[in-house]
Amino acid sequence: AQENETNESGSID
């Protein structure tokens, strides 16, 4: 996971 709104797959919400 990352510090922003990205999931493990890298898709941004």
Curated annotation (Swiss-Prot):
Predominant location: membrane
Subcellular location per the Swiss-Prot or TrEMBL entry: Cell membrane
Keyword field: Cell membrane, Glycoprotein, GPI-anchor, Lipoprotein, Membrane, Phosphoprotein
Superkingdom to which the source organism belongs: Eukaryota
Record note on modification: This peptide displays a high degree of glycan microheterogeneity resulting mainly from a variable number of mannose residues in each glycan. Both N-linked and O-linked glycans are high mannose.
Entry keyword annotation includes Membrane: yes
GO cellular component: plasma membrane; side of membrane
Glycosylation site residues: 4, 7, 9, 11
Membrane topology: Lipid-anchor; GPI-anchor
Protein name (Swiss-Prot/TrEMBL): GPI-anchored glycoprotein NETNES
Organism: Trypanosoma cruzi
